[in-house]
Amino acid sequence: MDKLLIFGGLPLKGEVTISGAKNAALPIMASTLLAQGVHIFKRIPKLRDVFTMTELIKRMGGIVEFNELCKINTIKINKFEASYDLVKTMRASILVLGPLVARFGRAKVSLPGGCAIGARPVNLHINGLQKMGAKISLQEGYIIAKASRLMGTKIYFDIPTVTGTENLMMAATLAKGTTIIENAAKEPEIVDLANYLILMGAKIEGAGTSIIKVEGVDELKPPQEYEIIPDRIETGTFIAIAGACGGDISLKGCRIDHIDAIILKMKDAGISFKEIENGIRVIGPKRLQAVDIKTMPYPGFPTDMQAQFMAMMTVANGTSVIKETIFENRFMHVAELRRMGADITVEGNTATIRGVKKLKGAPVMATDLRASASLVIAGLIAEEETLIDRIYHLDRGYEELDKKLIQLGARIQRIK
């Protein structure tokens, strides 16, 4: 199992190209099951979760080529199962459920695994598909779904759900009639998925708002080559790295219109930004200022940036308060940051961080994807060596993060 050895305390300077968004790539890859033919993508990141989705599609009969471009051939899809051994490693595997039921009238998908950061129930997906006419049962840990043809309906989410919105939007594209999804999630990744579905011939209005309207069509067809949006969480993570290290980093290929809340809070912490061609330049201060945040659905401050922001705040001037409102059990990185000298207390969904002048390197363990990124940030600003175990979590969501950091001047070694 790989580990990362980080020698902290070095200034980071240079240029980084932001990878394609994992959370856009995964649903768009799942959407290829809706349309027979060859789908061609630019900027799909080479990540553990992407390779899991690739294997899922291959086992169903798809052919996937992964070079500079990603090509997915769905002509010979003849199996409709997502097995436990793959789904347990990635919750986003549930995204094949809607497309399979919509196009083939059946699906067998294992209940999800993936991050250990909360229940993330799939009942919203199941309830929505049932409203569209699917017959669904749970058998031995699998969701078994059948439908002759899904029917358009009105669906209301009690709470906005990103994967639920994506799954039901995909399913609705081939349903008979009109589907309206109310209290839909608004994330940019949902808009990117909708844009790809529209290019395939889907009729979708309102993606990126709380009400999405989908008029079903009889058939979808693969469009020309499509480019995935840049990863806003990777962008935010590198902003946090620049801020924490007092760095000067240019981020190329990012979309600043996707990260308004992140940029506003980073500015409050003392980080400076300059727009450059096709990106932004991020300049960290001599010392960060403490800032409070509350995680919220998009366009609020993203829960996927909470751990990285906390790592910054461990060495900020003053006391900051972080409220986590999206997922329970998402402060698992706190114990590891404390091992490095951070002064953090947690009560319920609220963490209070009293900034210290220095962190000290220590052996620590990654518990989930974004927690692993927070430990990398802590390691970069700490004195002496930090050894991070279980970095397979990091590889699930960041494309060659260690190599990108080395380009900026970090001393990092991957240990097998």
Swiss-Prot record:
Task: Give the EC number(s) listed in the UniProt record.
Answer: 2.5.1.7
Can you say where in the cell this protein is located? Cytoplasm
BP-aspect Gene Ontology terms: cell division; cell wall organization; peptidoglycan biosynthetic process; regulation of cell shape; UDP-N-acetylgalactosamine biosynthetic process
**Membrane-spanning parts:** none
Pathway info: Cell wall biogenesis; peptidoglycan biosynthesis
Keywords assigned: Cell cycle, Cell division, Cell shape, Cell wall biogenesis/degradation, Cytoplasm, Peptidoglycan synthesis, Pyruvate, Transferase
Query: Which residues are modified to 2-(S-cysteinyl)pyruvic acid O-phosphothioketal?
Result: 115
**What's the main place this protein lives?**
cytoplasm
Record keyword Cell division present: yes
Binding positions for UDP-N-acetyl-alpha-D-glucosamine per the UniProt entry: 91, 304, 326
Under the heading Pfam families, the entry gives: EPSP_synthase
Where, by residue number, does phosphoenolpyruvate bind?
Answer: 22-23
A molecular function GO annotation: UDP-N-acetylglucosamine 1-carboxyvinyltransferase activity
Xref: SUPFAM superfamilies = EPT/RTPC-like (SSF55205)
CDD domains according to UniProt: UdpNAET
Q: Does the keyword Cell cycle apply?
A: yes
Regarding protein family, the annotation reads: Belongs to the EPSP synthase family. MurA subfamily.
State what protein this is by name: UDP-N-acetylglucosamine 1-carboxyvinyltransferase
Q: What organism is the protein native to? A: Thermodesulfovibrio yellowstonii (strain ATCC 51303 / DSM 11347 / YP87)
Designated gene of the protein: murA
